[in-house]
Structure formats: structure tokens, C-alpha cells
Regions:
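Small beta-barrel nucleic-acid-binding modules, primarily SNase/OB-fold domains
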Residues: 1-179
Length: 179
């Protein structure tokens, strides 16, 4: 009679190797899927859509011609949170600029919350840059906002928007303080 437990160590090793291979293959598939997703986003650039909602000073909702809703985070800027000083003003300013307007999205990526991250054009106007110029957002250097540093400095000197506050708090710092 055959002993089914005779090769237990070999079976355990085979099972472990199979499991490791499965984990590796799954990770490679996920990596490839993200690469394809990012490549696909780049391929469909630019996207033209109508702004149908404003969440805050750096997030809006857009409706494409195919009736697809996109939650869009403005690339390279950081506006005050809604509960933060100048948060409501930043939201209103973005709304005044783009609500119910047809805009062009130049997608850069997708953020950890699943939002499309994009530079937004309204005709020849770079909306992201305009929010910084008008003093309703910081140049988000961590995410490519260094191109807007001069606009931020000019808004600070002119005391525009949030720069009227004697000591404005960056949204990232405000979020840490209000966890």
C-alpha cells in the first residue's frame, strides 16, 4: 500500500513555490494593468468635457460627451480645504472660472483616491495656474507645481486671496493638524 504522507516535505515545498509564483504573477499583472491604464490615459489625452460639479478649490466633476463622469483633481496645485480659512472662497473661485464650461483635460495620472489628475484648460487659460495667480491655491511643489512658484510669489506680494491672511496654513499641514 502507498503512503500518501511519504513525500510531505516535497509537497510542502511545491505548495510554497506555487504560492510564491502565484503572488508574483498577481503582482506583475497588477503592475502591467496600471501601466496599461496610465498609457491608455495618455493615449486619450486630451479629454474635452463640461464641468458639472465643484467639490472644492482643486477638485471638480466633469461630464464627457460619452456621458462619463470624471472626478478631476487639478494637477500641481493645492487649494485650502473646505473647512479651512479661504476654503469656501477657493471653491467659489474655481466655480466662477469653470462651472458649466467646456474644458480640456490634459491628464497626468490617477491619484490614490481614484481621481483623474489633470491640467485644465479653458480656451487659452490654464485654470490650475490661474487659481495660484489669483491667490486661491498653493503651487504644489511636491507634485510638479514648481512651474507656478513665480505666480504664487506674485499673489503673496499682492496679498491676493488666501494671502490676505497674515499666516496662511498650507492644506497639507492643516490636514495633519486636523486629523
Amino acid at each position: 500500500m502507498l503512503n500518501p504522507f511519504k513525500h510531505k516535505p516535497a509537497l510542502a515545498i511545491l505548495t510554497a513555490l506555487t504560492g510564491a509564483a502565484l503572488v508574483y504573477a498577481t503582482n506583475q499583472f497588477a503592475f502591467a494593468q496600471n501601466a496599461v491604464k496610465n498609457t491608455a490615459q495618455q493615449a486619450i489625452n486630451p479629454i474635452i468635457c463640461r464641468v458639472v460639479g465643484i467639490a472644492d478649490g482643486d477638485t471638480l466633476t466633469c461630464l464627457t460627451d460619452a456621458k462619463q463622469q470624471l472626478k478631476v483633481r487639478l494637477h500641481a496645485i493645492d487649494a485650502p480645504e473646505k473647512q479651512q480659512a479661504f476654503g469656501q472662497q477657493a471653491k467659489k473661485h474655481l466655480s466662477d472660472l469653470v462651472y458649466n464650461q467646456t474644458v480640456t483635460l490634459n491628464i497626468t495620472n490617477t491619484d490614490r483616491y481614484g481621481r483623474t489628475v489633470a491640467d485644465i484648460q479653458l480656451g487659452s487659460l490654464n485654470v490650475n495656474q490661474q487659481m495660484v495667480k489669483d491667490g486661491y491655491a498653493w503651487a504644489y511643489q511636491r507634485y510638479g507645481g514648481s512651474r507656478y512658484i513665480q505666480d504664487e510669489k506674485a499673489a503673496r506680494q499682492a496679498k491676493l486671496g488666501l494671502w490676505r491672511d497674515a499666516q496662511p496654513i498650507e492644506p497639507s499641514q492643516w490636514r495633519r493638524m486636523n486629523k
